[in-house]
């Protein structure tokens, strides 16, 4: 049994650590494990199958103790969730450097990872779990909102009103889907095998209602579609069973996607025909049989998606590697539907835009509302962005420390960072602000089945870019920097980097913020310009980014 522990971040203006950066790292580590934030905090699991914040509780305690004693010119090294060393560096160096789940390519398989995991040698960090910047489902909801908004623009005249979106998976990431769809005016029918997860999304205002009856769910969805009413419905069921049944019934949704944890067949996907308890028993008793059955179920799931696509459903992969698993199981046409990045998001990446986020260390929601006003004032010409902030204020329930996310691009991030730092310096905000982002960003990830799928020059699998991103953020003075493997899509399919920087109101922080919040999105523009995207080339030239070989 997992050790029962409750972790929550300290808040307020008093710090226990020797500097605000160390204090911020401590609070954000604990925020990742807050019971309102983490999916399975007793097991240190934050989201995404087995994405963890620390390798085990002993490692967690050692990380906490070390952060409390860490000097302002020292750097703590984290190897797959374990604190392994402290070295004296300098005040502008990162206080923490993190490497999670990284395996030499020929060994980068789930089988080898699980062997090492059993020995206590490694940890799966997902993206923001092991890099201590997860903020609950809000962390993905604007990206999900933007994705569905682009679906609406491309296929439905700019709104999802009068449409049904069918999806599955209501975990930490997938839980954002119902709210994103209803924010775009549509009906969302979301299948989830675990009723507790559905209830959690209802409790946090991401989902409207739940049922265990397919007929009742369809009746509600069709009626709301007819009335052009926004509604989200959580259906208790297994997607590998429900989708084939819907195909038999002749039901075709308007939009179809999936956010189950198909990237990890052992820990993230329940095989068809099993209850949650039966699945847990089989997983422990015979993991190989479990994986085989889960993969067969994933294949059936994708075959049903393909059948619906042929009947007219706008279908896309939402970044969980479900197509690859199905293809490996013999579904030869699994890649007949596109991934969400090339279909809907890449133009934003070309401008250096991505899921920028910030957290109020004070714990006071008023600090976030004041920063919202900064966005509405300083970026008033960006109506999409302002619309998002206004909707977020009304619809987003904070999980753990108050936080906000919005997609800002090159130039915008640095401008925002300076304003926030000035507000901390003047006492307009009660405590420092943590600024970070998802690893899913314009220049920080190599993932051929997701963020870098179908690159114009064929450079999908080149992983130099996230490594350069991490190096650049470290020398620029980010507060903590991370390099992970396997986030989102599983072992062997991605390399990605994260950064977090603290606005503590000091002049030194102002300089670090200007450097990091310029170079971090700047590399995203460079990566896409180098691949030949005209929008990125134009952005690089307009912004004066120095690319020696740019024509």
From Swiss-Prot:
Catalytic activity entry: 4-imidazolone-5-propanoate = trans-urocanate + H2O
An example Gene Ontology molecular-function term: urocanate hydratase activity
Keyword Chloroplast appears in the UniProt entry: no
GO CC terms of this entry: cytoplasm
InterPro entries in the cross-refs: Urocanase, Urocanase-like, Urocanase_C, Urocanase_central_sf, Urocanase_CS, Urocanase_N, Urocanase_Rossmann-like, Urocanase_sf
Keywords for the protein's UniProt record, in alphabetical order: Cytoplasm, Histidine metabolism, Lyase, NAD
Protein's cellular compartments: Cytoplasm
Annotated residues for binding of NAD(+): 48-49, 126, 172-174, 192, 197, 238-239, 259-263, 269-270, 318, 488
Active site, renumbered: 406
Keyword Cytoplasm tagged: yes
Superkingdom field: Bacteria
The protein's enzyme class: lyase
Function: Catalyzes the conversion of urocanate to 4-imidazolone-5-propionate.
Family statement: Belongs to the urocanase family.
Protein name as it appears in the record: Urocanate hydratase
